[in-house]
Amino acid sequence: MPNTSEKYKTDYYFKKEDDLNPIVFIHGVGLTKEIWSPQLEFFKDHNILTYDLLGHGKTPLEKTQLNFEDFTRQLLNLIKELEINKIHLVGFSLGSLIARHFAAIHGDKLSSLVLHGSIYKRSEEQKRVVQNRFELIKSDKPASKDRSLRRWFSDKFLKENKEIYDKIFSMLDENDHNNFLKAYKLFVNYEDDDQMLNNINTNTLVTTGQHDVGSTTEMAKNLSEKIKGAKYIEIKDGKHLCSIECSKEFNKAIELFVDQNYDNA
């Protein structure tokens, strides 16, 4: 059921069916835990935890600047408060960067790790594109949100699923814009730390959409090769939010990987 952490004010949804380690989903910048609806339905017989990141959805942000330690601490505090010993962690986009940081520091809390739509070693041109996008987004105009949606989904999918377009657009529109910019700035200026990746010892799956222009298949393959023993899966026909558009294939990949890594010690 939806709830808010009494001590840390994080808004979350936690469904506990049994004593198995839960799957925790971390959303991307500008979004909320509501993007995981297809996963909540598919994994309805599993223990599931989703939550709103700092400054997103119903979770407040009381800092003028954000860093990954803040996001890592947020997740650690939440699972401690819920008395969860270990988790299967799935991070998307900015959420995947948070998951990488968490795994490098708190690997003892993880049974498995899934990094979906994760950037890695952006080229100078890719950095320029993201920086230009950040400048446009500062204006908070509807056109910037529309461009995001068309980058995240195929035109065909948006045409056939107007309710999804409206839902995600509203999600972006209802954000506190200043808080959104704090998180987006962190994403825009992100520099990969290979030493941190070397510290990840959790069984890891790296996934991305076949047609994701920001978190490319090349990035995902290279990231999977950098993390010890990591596996790589490309979601056919998917773009950035293929967890929604290609949810069947995405969910099956997650389910198989999680089922191979259950550990309730």
Write out the residue ranges for each language-model feature.
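Gly/Ala-rich beta-loop-alpha elbow adjacent to hydrolase catalytic centers
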Residues: 91-95, 99
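Conserved acidic catalytic loop of the alpha/beta-hydrolase fold
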Residues: 70-87
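Conserved HGGG/HGGXW glycine-rich cap/lid loop of the alpha/beta-hydrolase fold
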Residues: 15-60
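Catalytic histidine-centered segment of alpha/beta-hydrolase-like enzymes
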Residues: 238-247, 251
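Conserved alpha/beta-hydrolase catalytic His-Asp/Glu region
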Residues: 124-128, 141-198
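Flexible "cap/lid" loop of the alpha/beta hydrolase fold
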Residues: 100-105, 110-141
